Amino acid sequence: VSHVTVPSEGVMPSPLSLCRYLPRELSPSVDSRSCSIPLVAPRKAGKLFLGTTPPRAPGLPRRLAWFSIDWEQVCLMHRLGSGGFGSVYKATYHGVPVAIKQVNKCTEDLRASQRSFWAELNIAGLRHDNIVRVVAASTRTPEDSNSLGTIIMEFGGNVTLHQVIYDATRSPEPLSCRKQLSLGKCLKYSLDVVNGLLFLHSQSILHLDLKPANILISEQDVCKISDFGCSQKLQVLRGRQASPPHIGGTYTHQAPEILKGEIATPKADIYSFGITLWQMTTREVPYSGEPQYVQYAVVAYNLRPSLAGAVFTASLTGKALQNIIQSCWEARGLQRPSAELLQRDLKAFRGTLG
């Protein structure tokens, strides 16, 4: 969709919360706030840590081991990417490959930066094959560092699903990462992601920024959901009587209720998955045009990416895939399937392929 026609002001009030508008035009592959791990990696890494190393963390019980960093065991290798909210590095920790995320202290929105840091820790202590695990974290930083906190995460892989979908012909990665997504591969990755969502929702955690750029693909070809800087705990949201807290994310993947400023539910992640599955299937960008117009049309006119392509209409399998995607991005959250039901439907669909 290149242009969206929206009635002028005065015809009808905007269904969007005023605070949801973006401050500037962004590409659909970029977040509406920069809490996500950066997509673009610089060619050269600068000096990684400044000043002296913080004191070695005291011994902690195993169940609290993630809550402190043994700085003597950190060996930084190179920068993976950087953005307004910080930098991500590849490193080793106790000899094991990891990714280290440092959240900047001096940013345009310090409070949002702090929220992003603590949101990343919503999954601390949790383990699942399709979730990037938090290994350790600390608010202690080197004395001269510009960081308000450091998070050590499982190294989920060098490649994101976004790169596989859009950069296949230009990627310098091995051939195994550059081949096109077959229907079987698309369903395999989809089940990986849904399995991760099912686990998160069982732990009362909402991701709220699910998109291909936040899905890593490991060397074992397993998808892992990453970047929890926009995540929320469900019990916290349910306990709020007033307006919900500000939720970041990516406007192209946000459910209508999120764009309207309503309190999030697990069905918001299901909507985001529907857009992601559409991207895997078509290898196209969801929307183009002014973000605020797209947001308005998604809410007021039920705008969605096109399902008219031959990939959806030329075969029975395509039509079945079309039905799954449509069910995920229904306007009302109650009409969307749960992660459990979606997992069952995807497994049944994969079974029909033989």
Curated annotation (Swiss-Prot):
Entry's EC annotation: 2.7.11.1
Binding site residues for ATP: 80-88, 101
Catalysed transformations (reactions): L-seryl-[protein] + ATP = O-phospho-L-seryl-[protein] + ADP + H(+); L-threonyl-[protein] + ATP = O-phospho-L-threonyl-[protein] + ADP + H(+)
GO molecular function: ATP binding; protein serine kinase activity; protein serine/threonine kinase activity
Keywords: ATP-binding, Kinase, Nucleotide-binding, Oncogene, Serine/threonine-protein kinase, Transferase
Pfam families the UniProt entry points to: Pkinase (PF00069)
Active-site residues, Swiss-Prot/TrEMBL: 209
Domain Protein kinase stretches: 74-350
Family note: Belongs to the protein kinase superfamily. Ser/Thr protein kinase family.
Note: This protein is probably translated as a Gag-Mos polyprotein.
PANTHER family: SERINE/THREONINE-PROTEIN KINASE TNNI3K-RELATED (PTHR44329), V-MOS MOLONEY MURINE SARCOMA VIRAL ONCO HOMOLOG (PTHR44329:SF285)
Protein name in UniProt: Serine/threonine-protein kinase-transforming protein mos
